[in-house]
Swiss-Prot record:
Optimum pH is 9.75 with 4-aminobutanal as substrate. It comes from Malus domestica (Apple). This is Aminoaldehyde dehydrogenase 1, peroxisomal. Na(+) binds at residues 28, 99, 189. Belongs to the aldehyde dehydrogenase family. PROSITE patterns: ALDEHYDE_DEHYDR_CYS (PS00070), ALDEHYDE_DEHYDR_GLU (PS00687).
Amino acid sequence: MAIQIPSRLLFIDGEWREPVLKKRIPIINPATEEIIGHIPAATAEDVELAVEAARRALSRNKGRDWASAPGAVRAKYLRAIAAKIGERKPEIAKLEAIDCGKPLDEAAWDIDDVSGCFEYYAELAEGLDAQQKAPISLPMEQFKSHVLKEPIGVVGLITPWNYPLLMATWKVAPALAAGCAAILKPSELASVTCLELADVCREVGLPPGVLNILTGLGHEAGAPLVSHPHVDKIAFTGSTMTGSKIMTAAAQLVKPVSLELGGKSPIVVFDDVDIDKAAEWTAFGCFWTNGQICSATSRLILHENIATEFLDRLLKWCKNIKIADPLEEGCRLGPVVSGGQYEKILKSIETAKSEGARVLSGGDRPEHLKKGFFIEPTIITDVTTSMQIWREEVFGPVLCVKTFSSEDEALELANDTHYGLGAAVISKDLERCDRFSKGLQAGIVWINCSQPCFCQAPWGGNKRSGFGRELGKWGLDNYLTVKQVTEYVSDDPWGWYTSPSKL
């Protein structure tokens, strides 16, 4: 099925603009390794134009057009964006699948979530007005105090390639709901659908400069955005290494950041489980989105009493996963996003073998696919806690396995990581699950499942998985500042100093 990739420019101040230096980057279909189009490559010159446009959007008509407009005004645009994306779902889902390798059914699910996220933040935008001037109870009756919530200003949003449009929406929707003006810099490996978001914003008449979208390389477009003195906040999702660099750059300007970084999340399976149900959740938790999930539960911590039976069943589930072109009906595992990622994942598997681990299944290209960046679902056993495969994020369809004999041992293994994004526990004993969830050092815990995500619930991690929370009301708070306003209401003078009239 031939899909035409739209030829787009940068989106600045409500208009399509050629990059100042006229640079472009090829789009490579990860299923075929073919160049299927190009995206514009922004540089510091384009960042400057986008920042100027964003600041104009905030100050236009003394802020009444956007930043200080009633929340219902902003909600109207967010709902229009949600509706338009819903109308274009079949087209956008196919573009997503072709661009990043995600199976079409997953991409379609993502686009539904995109629309839902814009709708959700439209509701929160409407609710903001009622929260203004919330009174504060004070111990001194001579004073009254209230709180104002105001947009933080111009925000830079840097997003990854595994959920290109959805992860962008997680940042764009709350930022716009709060009244900020935003500059979105998606990953150069998968930017196509973010440029379609720009087209949607044009169609619905979003005020110029409220959302600007700059595609391009991290060091050419992302770095100037982070270090720009007139960008008030950076929100980033991506690798821990890049997140550390962003923190360092932002610190020079004491600029706030929120970071959602890497993970090496555990899934703990006790011996009282329904083995088929637990095996499917284990596979889904690691191989969904081709294994390219920051929260992937890629460390299976398995009770020794059921280890042999469970792994045998898990292998059968994995062999039943259809690996194919993302547009092929029934595809459940597509290619990883790029040649670079493909080589990195295979190297991680080879390193595990060289360190003494055993590849129980997978570990290579599927025999029936001669082209594309495809990797079989891979299960690795005989793992020790010092091995790289146990400690470092692979970001591919690779699951490593260790067994345990006691609950305390399982918890120790689960927390044996410098990451802390997600964790899952599977057991029929719900008291144990509750107890275990409290002991897990992670920002997200799943009980008897893995990876479900809802825009109403907070998302974010601990330790080297970053800080700050996206989604829910916490996601909106990311883009708001809190201002205290205190008024002296007594008719009496303050009386601290002696009045000159009494001298």
